[in-house]
């Protein structure tokens, strides 16, 4: 065992020396805690968003529906929807760059396929079909499938169970596309990204608006390949440079004020309209708010969120499980509350469903992550090797 470990160490050192002899940047082992914090906080925002979404009065398909005609809590959706997933793609682009500095392409493909593609394809038929079942129960879709054979119904439920996993499906596509881009550009573009000034970062709003107009799927509107692809590759080529984010952090107050102003305007002006479809989703004000929010969050968290404690470390470890599993207990509890406790006050319903989403996700994660094979299919987790 010692001989094996020594050989790995020797190979690592040879690779390190080889890279530096080529004049490449030395391997960066810096842990960027602020990115971990952005990720788990954003995941929590996504969960809260889905709790409110389940009872919203704007998008009525596939949800329980509103408690009354006008709901002020629906404003939360307008405040977070334009930027929350775009932010996750930006952070993902950054972390992909850091990963590739420590791993070769073969490891990258294997790791991303296992963690992203497997759960969002194989996992649908192993576990997420259960979510598809409740999605169809909530929407009343089973009434139209009474004569459909069981195997066909199972496939439909599996596809309906994609839910929040669309994010990792798209992320896998971007990750594989990045390999082709890297082969062509050979870090020439990436090196130029280090010099990006703050004023140019702000002007990238024009590109955000442009890319938000293209590569959007017509029916399932969450697949926005244009704007999410731009955020991912911008994260990789520009924001992965610590110098860029450091310069940006000096302007956090300005961007925070700009974000608050544009966010309030966007929410008030479009409140009541469907925020998840064109033209509300990709108009100029939505894109300005989206991009300035990303800049403000990166700047603020780099300045004040680059530390950790027991809670943040724990949340960072559990955020992946919370993201993958939260919608199932949320939908399940929401459905049975509608069936058996439909007269409960709105506040109580939100609390019960919200707690169920977080607690249920954590419970499912702890269970599934301990079951061999199933954890690989559903979470992309492999068995940890014990080192002696």
Model-inferred region functions:
Residues 5-8, 14-388:
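Alpha-helical transmembrane segments and their immediate juxtamembrane cytosolic regions
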């Amino acid at each position: 065992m010692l001989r094996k470990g020594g050989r790995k160490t020797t190979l690592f050192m040879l690779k390190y020396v080889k890279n530096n002899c080529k004049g490449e940047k030395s391997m960066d082992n810096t842990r960027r805690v602020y990115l971990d914090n952005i990720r788990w906080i954003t995941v929590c925002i996504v969960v809260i968003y889905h709790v409110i979404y389940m009872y919203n009065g704007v998008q009525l398909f596939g949800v329980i529906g509103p408690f009354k005609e006008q709901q002020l809590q629906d404003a939360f959706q307008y405040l977070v929807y334009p930027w929350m997933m775009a932010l996750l793609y930006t952070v993902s682009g950054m972390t992909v760059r850091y990963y590739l500095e420590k791993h070769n392409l073969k490891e990258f493909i294997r790791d991303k396929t296992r963690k992203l593609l497997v759960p969002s394809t194989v996992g649908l038929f192993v576990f997420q079909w259960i979510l598809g079942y409740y999605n169809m129960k909530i929407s009343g879709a089973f009434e139209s499938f009474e004569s459909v054979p069981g195997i066909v119904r199972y496939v439909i439920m599996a596809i309906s169970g994609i839910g929040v996993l669309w994010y990792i499906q798209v992320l896998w596509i971007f990750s594989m596309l990045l390999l082709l881009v890297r082969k062509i550009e050979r870090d020439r573009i990436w090196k130029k990204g280090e010099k990006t000034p703050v004023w140019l970062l702000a002007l990238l709003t024009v590109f955000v608006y442009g890319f938000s107009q293209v590569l959007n799927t017509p029916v399932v509107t969450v697949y926005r390949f244009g704007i999410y692809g731009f955020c991912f590759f911008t994260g990789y080529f520009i924001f992965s440079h610590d110098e860029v984010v450091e310069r940006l952090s000096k302007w956090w107050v300005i961007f925070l004020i700009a974000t608050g102003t544009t966010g309030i305007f966007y929410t008030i002006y479009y409140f009541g309209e469907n925020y998840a479809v064109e033209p509300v989703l990709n108009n100029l004000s939505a894109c300005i708010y989206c991009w300035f929010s990303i800049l403000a969050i990166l700047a603020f968290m780099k300045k004040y969120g680059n530390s950790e404690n027991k809670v943040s470390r724990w949340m960072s470890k559990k955020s992946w499980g919370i993201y993958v599993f939260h919608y199932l207990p949320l939908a399940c509890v929401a459905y049975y509350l509608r069936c058996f406790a439909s007269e409960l006050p709105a506040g109580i319903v939100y609390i019960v469903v919200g707690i169920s989403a977080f607690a249920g996700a954590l419970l499912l994660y702890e269970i599934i992550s301990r079951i061999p094979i199933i954890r690989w299919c559903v979470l992309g987790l492999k068995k940890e090797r014990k080192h002696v």
